[in-house]
Amino acid sequence: MVRKDYNHPCVVLYSTGNEIPEIGCPSGHEMNKKLVDALHQLDSTRYVTNAVSGFLAVAYHMEKHVENQRQEYDKAMNDAQGSEKMNAMASDVEKQMMDAFACSPLLNESILPIEEAVDVAGYNYLNARHTYIHKAHPEWVVVGSETYPTEIAELWNIVENNSHVIGDFTWTGYDYLGEAGIGIFHYDPTRLESGYQGWFPDRLAYCGDINLNGYRRPVSYLREIAYGLRTKPYLFARRVDKAGQRHDKNRWKYHDGVHSWTYPGYEGTETTVYVLTKDPEAELFLNGVSLGRKKVGEVEALTAVFEVPYQPGTLTVRTTSGEDSIVTAGEAVGLHAEASKTVLEKGGRDVCFITADLVDSEGHTNRFAVRRIQAVLEGEAVLAGFGSANPSCEGSYTDTAWDTFDGRVMAAVRSGMQPGKAELKLIMNGTVAAIIPIEVR
C-alpha cells in the first residue's frame, strides 16, 4: 500500500485501522505500535492515525468488570458486524451521555496508548473529545475520523475554532451498498424502535450526502453552508406523503426531505419546511404570500423551520444573502437526460454516466412520480449498469428496466474494445424518451 502510492499528493495520512475490536486491550496497543513504526519506516513524510471507536475500546475493560455481559461482548467481537453493533449502540445513546463518555477516565485508560503512538488522534463519534484532550495534551493533533452527518454544524465549529483539530470525515459522503438500512427511514409501526437495523429489501446504507445516482441530498447543502462555501439559502420540505407519520431514528438520519414541492393529492396536508442558511432570519413565501419569518438556529443549527400546509405553486425563501425556490411540477411526460461525457476511449476501460430525470411538459423536474424506464444500448459500447438510488428495493443493477426513485435513474456505459459509434435509448411508456449518442475512439 505504501510503496504503491509513495509520495502521491493525495495521500496525507495512513491509518493503522478503523474500529478495530481489540483496540482497547494490550495486544491491540502492541499491534498498533508495530504498524505505526512500520509505516514511519516505509514513509517518513506522511503522518499516521487510527480511527478509534470509543465503545469498542472500552468493551475490553467493561468485559473485565461486568461478567454477565461476557457472552454478548464475545459474540460482538467475533461477529463480522461487531463494529456496526457498537456504532448502533453509540447512536442510540443520548448526546449528553455520549459527550460525557468521550471525556471519561475509562476511555482515557483504554485508548491512551493508541493516542500516544500515532501522529494524529482519530476519533469516531467522540465529538467532545476533540477539545477535551487538548487540555491535557496541547501538543496532540486531532481529526474527526468518522462523524455523524447530522452534526456537521457542531463539528465544523470545533474545526474552525481549534487549530489542533485539522478536519472532519463524515460517514458518509457517498451512499453505498452494505450496512443496509442505517440511514433509511422506516415508517412501519412495527419497526419504529429499530434505529440501526435494516429490513428486507433494504440494500443501501442511505446515509450519504450524495445518493447512489450522484444526486445531492439536503444534508450535503447543510455541510456546504457550514463550510462557508454557499451563501444563498437552501430550501427543502419533508416528503408530504409521509407527513404526520413516525419513523425510526438515529444520528445517521437527517430529515426525510427532498428539494421538491410536487405532491398531487396531498393538498392541505401540513408538512415541515426547512431553510438552511447562516443568516439570522428567513422569510418564507407560498405563491407570493408571506408565511412569516423564522429565526435561524432556534430548533436546529443553521436552520429555520416552518410548518406549511401543502398547496401547489412556488415555495420561496428569502434571506439577506439570497433566495431559493421549489416549484410544483406537472405530470411527468418526458425525460431530461445528461451524460458525464459522450466520447470514450476504446479498450473497455472508459466509462460515462447518464442521468435521466422525469420532467413535465415545461421541463420542471418531477421528483414524486414513478415511471418504469428501460435502457437499450446499441453499438460499440456496453451497458455496465443501470438503476435508481432507491435504498430499499429488489432488482439488479444489471437489469435493463428500473423504476425511478425521486424522479431519477442512472446508466453506466463502458467503452467497447474497438472504435465506433454507440447509442443509449431510454424508453418510457413504450416510447423513446431520450437518446444519448456516444463515440468510442
Give the residues covered by each predicted segment.
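Active-site groove signature of glycoside hydrolases
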Residues: 2-26, 110-113
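Substrate-binding clefts and catalytic carboxylate motifs of secreted carbohydrate-active enzymes
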Residues: 14, 37-41, 48-349, 361-366
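Beta-strand signatures of extracellular beta-sandwich domains
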Residues: 281-285, 372-376, 425
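Short aromatic-acidic-glycine turn motif
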Residues: 294, 334-336, 376-392
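Short, hydrophobic beta-strand segments
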Residues: 305-310, 398-417
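Short beta-strand elements
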Residues: 322-331, 431-441
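Short, solvent-exposed loop/turn segments enriched in Ser/Thr/Gly
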Residues: 348-354, 420
